[in-house]
């Protein structure tokens, strides 16, 4: 697990002479990075919202490719956090077997955009491995395992995770839950 914190002088506003507020991370953002990923907001363990990763379509090598939209991500993060003390939990990812160089570069770019937006907004971020958050959440392995676990935990929001392609949403929720533990 890797954690990057904002320097305390920037993170803790002064309340009075020599007193600093103690951050209370009741708002946790879970991030499944990549163009097919998602962002979830939990407040005191309650799922408040989940959003597909903002993307933009660009032309690369004469074909259309989706990639994370920096401006869209910044606007979304701002709308989720506002002035509240928040922490972010992002999946720590590495190269996957059989993944091409171009694909790895694109994915790394997405993670860099996420890290940059969080740093600019002074939101501390912790990176957790997939194995770590899956174990903490009790989800079975695989895309359907995450979706099933989230639907068990949040049955009233099950419609948000009904499609197979909603696995990124489910992962983001479980990542946030793992970070709130």
Which residue ranges define each predicted feature?
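Phosphate- and other anionic-substrate recognition elements at nucleic-acid/protein interfaces
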Residues: 1-181
């Amino acid at each position: 697990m890797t954690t990057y914190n904002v320097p305390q002088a920037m993170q803790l506003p002064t309340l009075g002479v020599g007193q600093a507020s103690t951050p209370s991370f009741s708002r946790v953002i879970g991030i499944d990075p990549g163009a097919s990923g998602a962002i979830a907001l939990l407040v005191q363990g309650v799922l408040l919202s989940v959003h597909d990763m903002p993307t933009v379509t660009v032309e690369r090598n004469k074909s259309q490719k989706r990639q994370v939209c920096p401006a869209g991500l910044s606007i979304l993060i701002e709308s989720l956090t506002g002035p509240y003390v928040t922490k972010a939990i992002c999946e720590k990812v590495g190269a996957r077997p059989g993944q091409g160089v171009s694909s790895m570069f694109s994915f790394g770019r997405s993670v860099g955009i996420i890290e940059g937006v969080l740093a600019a907004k002074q939101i501390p971020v912790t990176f957790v491995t997939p194995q770590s958050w899956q174990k903490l959440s009790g989800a079975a392995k695989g895309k359907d395992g995450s979706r099933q676990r989230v639907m068990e935990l949040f049955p009233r929001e099950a419609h948000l995770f009904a499609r197979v392609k909603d696995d990124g949403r489910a992962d983001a929720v479980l990542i946030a839950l793992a970070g709130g533990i």
